[in-house]
Structures are given as C-alpha cells and as structure tokens.
Amino acid sequence: MIILKSPHEIECIRKASKLTADTLSLLVKMAKPGITTLELDTIAEEYIRSHGGIPSCKGYYGFPATICASINEEVVHGIPSAKRKLKNGDVLSIDLVSSIDGYHGDSAVTIPIGHVKPDVMKLLKVTEESLFKGIEQVKVGNRIGAIGHAVQTYCEKHGYGVVRDFVGHGLGREMHEDPQIPNYGSLDQGPLMKPGMVLCIEPMITLGTHRVRVLGDDWTAVTVDGKPAAHFEHTVVVTENGPEILTMREEPRLIK
C-alpha cells in the first residue's frame, strides 16, 4: 500500500533527509586513499548521533553498520571493515539512511578515490546523470515506470548494464515502503504518481553485465563479471509542481 504523506510528515522526512545529505557530504570529503571503510562508518555514526539522529541501517535485519560501503565490483550492501582500506583508483559507493523522530532520509553516492580510470569515471558520470533523468519524470499523473524507463534508456544508450535485482522504493516511517521503483521498464507500468508520495530513486549501473550475486556474508552484492558498478540515490517528494529532492547536498553533482 502506498502511503501519501501529509505536509507535517514531509517536513519530518525533510529533516532526516538533510541529516543524511550532510553526513554524505562529510564522507565524500573524508574518503581518501588509506582510510578504511570502518573508519568512515564510525565517522558517519558519530555525526548522525551528535545531530540528533539514528543510523537507520544499523541493526536492520541484522546489518552491522551505519553505512553500506561497496567498492568497485560491489554493487550494494557492502559491510564496512577495518581490513578494507581505500586505494587509489577505487570507486566507493556509500548508501546511507538516517532517521529523526521516526522518519527516514535515504541517499547514496559513488565516490572516485584518487585517480580513477576514464571508463570508470564515465560510468559514474552517466549513472549520476541517469538519477536526474529519472527524477525529471516525477510528475503528477506519470506512472512510476516512467522513472525506470528514463534511467534504462539513458544508461543502455551508453552500453551499460542496469541492475534488476535491486530497486528503489517508497520511504517514510519505514525505510522501505511501496511502491517499488525499478530502474528499467516502460512508461505505462506501475501506479500513478500523486502529491505526497515520497520516493527513493536509485540507479545501480554496471560497466558490464547487469547480473549480480550475493557473497557469503549474505549482504554484499557483486557483479558476476567482476566489472565496476555505480550507485546514486536521492529521496524525492512528488508535488503538484514536480519533484522536490529532499537529500540534495550543497554540491548538487558529485561527478563533473
């Protein structure tokens, strides 16, 4: 069931989303060669808690950390570790959810670490651009499928794989609510968008095949061909005037 949010609820989600965005901005600055993903996780948790929030992912179905930290061929749900030290040329996807007063804000970025190969940088750029292509389709009267259609069309035009196994979602008091928001499909699929819907749009795009598998930790999803992946996400509310991005950072685009 899709829950339309009241103006008060949207304000609550806005507060959580700003905290998520601010935390991600801090992590982008801290993610350099030599730092471990566990150190980044500690920074994120301390920042969220010191600003009155709760790290939503920690303990969610047993997930042990504040951030999902996925490196290179890892698509989503990588577990931070003291043994995972970032290296020059890596790409690091950080997916982060924080909550304030029972409402969540969800966002993700993929960060180039040091000097990254041009073909991988292009993957990051196109993936981030595809997120905004999807957000452009957030209009009253459009169907949810218009979002995925825009993402898929743009990314496949560049020869990239569009992950099918993980999708975007609604958000509110629960971290994952209806509707599901695939990054593929046709314009006429899915429910109609209505004012008050809060959507997490999150393209997960690969340099090779779209197929993924989950590692033995039961969390980390990787590309089956070992090629790099990118992941960007925003929390967006549907309004009569179009989309409003609630998790926008001060620097709107990470990849220039």
Predicted regions and their residues:
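Active-site neighborhoods and metal-handling regions in enzymes and metal-associated proteins
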Residues: M1-K256
